[in-house]
Amino acid sequence: MPPALRVRFAPSPTGYLHIGGARTALMNFLQARRQGGTFVLRMEDTDQGRSTPESVQAILDGLNWLGIDWDEGPGKEGPYAPYFQMQRLDTYRKHADQLIAEGKAYRCYCTKEDLDAQRQVAEKAGGAFKYPGTCRERTEPPAGRNAADAVIRFKMPAGDGSVSFTDKALGTITKTHSDLDDWVMMRADGIPVYNFGCVIDDHLMDITLVARGQEHVNSTFPQLMLYQALGWTPPDFAHLPLILGPDREKLSKRKHPEADVMVHKRNGVMPEALLNFVIRLGWSHGNDEVISREQMLEWFDFSDVGTTSGVWNPEKLLWLNQQWMKQLPVETVVERLLPFLEAKGIQAKGDPRLETLVRTLRERSNTLEDIATTAANVYFRSGITLDEKAATKHLSGESLNLLRKVRETLTALPEWSVEALDGVVKQVSEASSVGMGKVAQPIRVALTGNTTSPGIGETLVLVGRDESLLRIDAALTRG
């Protein structure tokens, strides 16, 4: 029987949760849940200049907002703890010392200046720089240097061999040993580099499948050589397609603000919509576009991941977000809308109009921010600024007379409901022998300032009885 599936997401906490990282985490999470496996969260926090507790928290916040929960990791300590690389330095040192003792790694005393000079020579010759093995056979440090100054390099096997692996997404990939050099495993300060630390951790944490972005394909070859040197069986690999920005360049923290998961939360995107959007950047299920978490859990498999880069399409994300705002229970949307209203100075919790507001505005809004902006500008304020062009057309002459008739009828209306208010429009329309649109537009302009709004009954309910009558009275003063 094969070992139980164990997958991991291992970000470097140097800032916010990147969209590419969120997709990697999501796919690993889905595969683990689908197969009854374990999803591990590990922090590769070895960049001491940039890794901060705030960045760790930003990643945790992003995953929590998306609803991607882990089985082991920060806050959920398991049998393979600790889950921060900086708390595992003794483990890396132990395995580095073992490789040195077995002649499979060595201390390198070359300075940055030495390597820069060698790199310049290679570039002038038109070739790529490869470490020439200057310290490969050294048994003692050169004069003036000691072991504390040395990095530790992996000793690539001599000869014309090759290394290959079969990727679950990309198929079989091969490189010759001559394409690889003696790469640095440990820095002089005892901190492991990526290729070394992740292999040690993946093995000791019993990770059975490593799924990560295609930018890590070339890292897989030195990692496989390390597995071989340590006598370990490597996990399976799946490399996921790149995500490109709208400019078709790799989605980057420096160039693309949309790379930050939490930007979308602040913009009023629903987590269901963002998950739906990112899963389809490299994976699809037939012609299905709106895909729920439950459907992802049923359908997703790494073997179905494509190889073509996904391109960020902001219009598609907004479309999906509108679909999700319309599909989710109105109570859920109301709860998520409240912080956006509060940010605009509107304390609306418990306001009986909120459910009607959401039902009405989500049909014509792309984000929670859109709904909140419309609510603040039209429904949760005193008075309204009229669009002069709309007012000139719809608040003069016969239109104003129709509005007066509406005002008179509203005064005596016992029930301020959508049905009753729509009935007023119909009543005035029939009594005046004009179409309902002729009656509705003056009301709409008086209430909202322009010619577009939800239905008249809904708009009157949202503005409220007292404020509606005040706005209509203000409009009638134009006559």
Curated annotation (Swiss-Prot):
Catalytic reactions of this protein: tRNA(Glu) + L-glutamate + ATP = L-glutamyl-tRNA(Glu) + AMP + diphosphate
Top enzyme category: ligase
Cofactor binding remark: Binds 1 zinc ion per subunit.
Localization per Swiss-Prot or TrEMBL: Cytoplasm
Keyword ATP-binding found: yes
CDD domains, alphabetized: GluRS_core
UniProt superkingdom: Bacteria
UniProt GO cellular component terms: cytosol
Functional note: Catalyzes the attachment of glutamate to tRNA(Glu) in a two-step reaction: glutamate is first activated by ATP to form Glu-AMP and then transferred to the acceptor end of tRNA(Glu).
The name this protein goes by in its record: Glutamate--tRNA ligase
Organism listed in the record: Myxococcus xanthus (strain DK1622)
Taxon lineage: Bacteria, Pseudomonadati, Myxococcota, Myxococcia, Myxococcales
Gene from which the chain derives: gltX
